[in-house]
From Swiss-Prot:
Family: Belongs to the class I-like SAM-binding methyltransferase superfamily. MenG/UbiE family.
Pfam family, one: Ubie_methyltran
GO molecular function, one term: demethylmenaquinone methyltransferase activity
Biological pathway: Quinol/quinone metabolism; menaquinone biosynthesis; menaquinol from 1,4-dihydroxy-2-naphthoate: step 2/2
Reactions catalysed according to its record: a 2-demethylmenaquinol + S-adenosyl-L-methionine = a menaquinol + S-adenosyl-L-homocysteine + H(+)
Enzyme class: transferase
EC number: 2.1.1.163
Protein name: Demethylmenaquinone methyltransferase
InterPro entries for this protein: SAM-dependent_MTases_sf (IPR029063), UbiE/COQ5_MeTrFase (IPR004033), UbiE/COQ5_MeTrFase_CS (IPR023576)
Keyword set, alphabetical order: Menaquinone biosynthesis, Methyltransferase, S-adenosyl-L-methionine, Transferase
Organism: Staphylococcus aureus (strain MRSA252)
Superkingdom field: Bacteria
Amino acid sequence: MADNKANKEQVHRVFQNISKKYDRLNNIISFEQHKVWRKRVMKDMGVRKGMKALDVCCGTGDWTIALSKAVGSTGEVTGIDFSENMLEVGKEKTASMENVKLVHGDAMELPFEDNSFDYVTIGFGLRNVPDYLVALKEMNRVLKPGGMVVCLETSQPTLPVFKQMYALYFKFVMPIFGKLFAKSKEEYEWLQQSTFNFPGKEELKRMFEEADFINVRVRSFTGGVAAMHLGYKEKDNTKGD
């Protein structure tokens, strides 16, 4: 528990400090591929108008904005993040969107009732949560029966060429970007370590299943440097018609 608390405090400091530069940093580190990946994921999701969505670890709101457009004026999107500064940037970006609400909170203790949302997403945020499984179980709890959960995250490439390129990128290139944008060694080291240490796609799929998601499928992007995990909460078949 002490390690988790220290971890959470460190992550909070990092994102409080890089909030104003986060979008630019994300574009540079991913070579803007995160936008391409998210568009593909949104296509796979097939979000319907009028639905309620929750974007966990919403950060500055990029996925929240995409969901807002997808659910339309009759739908609702809630974004939640534990960094107040990241949320401030997100509020500026979503100021004109009447169907968006951004709230401050913890992914491991979501402040929502059970069975509240049709979709729950988390993009490039799960790796920053101290306990992945706890967060996934919370996402399951607030998802409606039959609802969809989607995670878009960095992953560990399996193809030999991409594995070598990935290792070289994290050893030599990412530290340079980190030093340019981060204020301290702690910040850029965290960005590097959290990504490199994140579970591979098969291990994460097992976690989804352990969190009681069903029909979990995985889709890799760009040689496996990122992956989508999409699953569902089991429908409640105990109720009659």
